[in-house]
Amino acid sequence: MSIDKSKIMKAVGKPVRMTYPGSEGTHRGVLNFREIAWSGKGRTGALYCTVVDIIRFDGKREPWLRIGYYRQPTGTTLPRWASQTTYCGPLSQWRNNVLPVLQKLLKRAAQSIA
């Protein structure tokens, strides 16, 4: 059994919304681009995949990047959006703040398994 990529990719080009906790409101936009990283089976046999999305939110001057995941329970054919929360932010924030930290962590992880 595998996750049907077309079911996950069908969201590209469709409206999305993101609601902040509290009183910060809701962003609405369009999912412009998506890449899938296959994660494999969990301990219960459910299938997982991580998605990296580029979203163009209304009124924002640059696209935002979001990372989330889908889960397909054993015995089903429909993957479901499973991220309770996601990290979503402008591309410049990822480039300037998040990617340098991820690079450090990946380097440490690679050294620890070498």
Q: Where do the protein language model's features map onto the residues?
A:
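Negatively charged, low-complexity tracts enriched in Asp/Glu with abundant Ser/Thr
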Residues: 1-48
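Mixed-charge, Lys/Arg-enriched low-complexity segments
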Residues: 2, 6-7, 71-114
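Weak global preference for isoleucine
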Residues: 3, 8, 36, 54-55, ...
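Compositionally biased, intrinsically disordered low-complexity segments
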Residues: 19, 39, 55-58, 101
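A short, structured beta-strand/loop element
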Residues: 47-82
